Design a protein with these regions (language model features):
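Active-site-adjacent structural elements in enzyme catalytic cores
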Residues: 1-194
């Protein structure tokens, strides 16, 4: 159930609120996203009850934008996977400039795209559930503790309910961290072999 007094806003207003450091709920093609801009990142971790040292994905508006967040040049398999699955439910973990890793995704949901465009840059995103809890397909399913803590929600068609596939290409590896119906270990290995 959605929290009492949850404020529904347009994608354009959501972009403005995110630039101000607010945190919100946005539908994606997978599960409901808990999103924030850079100014709201610490609050996002607080709302989710997640250790700020844990990785979080960045949503981007285009494949080139997402791949540019990793060390240049991106691995050839990253380009191949991006071409096949983006926009869509795939998170790539890449080596980041200056060390560490970065998880990037280009969503396919029109509302998510509109919020990204309005925000004018990448958004930090995670599933809208308490750390360790189940992800929600629709806004109405979001844990009341989450919906009560966020600043806004943007309405839109619910996603599939299946979280995105996650492929780790950091350190020269090819590891499937989360399989989906559309990307299995066998399919990833076939794509990796070219």
């Amino acid at each position: 159930m959605l929290g009492f007094g949850l404020r529904y806003v347009s994608a354009a207003e959501a972009g403005e609120l995110l630039r101000e450091g607010r945190v919100g709920l946005v539908p994606t093609e997978t599960v409901v996203g808990l999103v924030a801009g850079k100014a709201g990142l610490s609050r996002l971790f607080e709302i989710k009850g997640r250790d700020s040292g844990k990785p979080i994905a960045l949503l981007c508006g285009a494949a080139e934008e997402a791949l540019a967040l990793g060390r240049e040049p991106p691995p050839p398999l990253a380009r191949s996977l991006a071409g096949r699955f983006w926009p869509g439910p795939l998170t790539l973990v890449l080596d980041a400039e200056g060390g560490g890793t970065v998880g990037v995704r280009v969503p396919a949901h029109p509302v998510t795209w509109a919020v990204l465009a309005s925000h004018g840059g990448q958004l930090y995103a995670t599933s809208a559930n308490l750390s360790g809890g189940s992800a929600s397909r629709a806004l109405e399913e979001v844990d009341p503790a989450i919906s009560a803590a966020v600043d806004f929600a943007v309405r839109g068609e619910p996603g599939s309910g299946e979280a995105s596939a996650v492929v780790d290409l950091s350190g020269g590896n090819v590891r499937l961290l989360r399989a989906t119906k559309s990307l299995t270990e066998d399919e990833l290995m076939r794509l990796a072999k070219g």
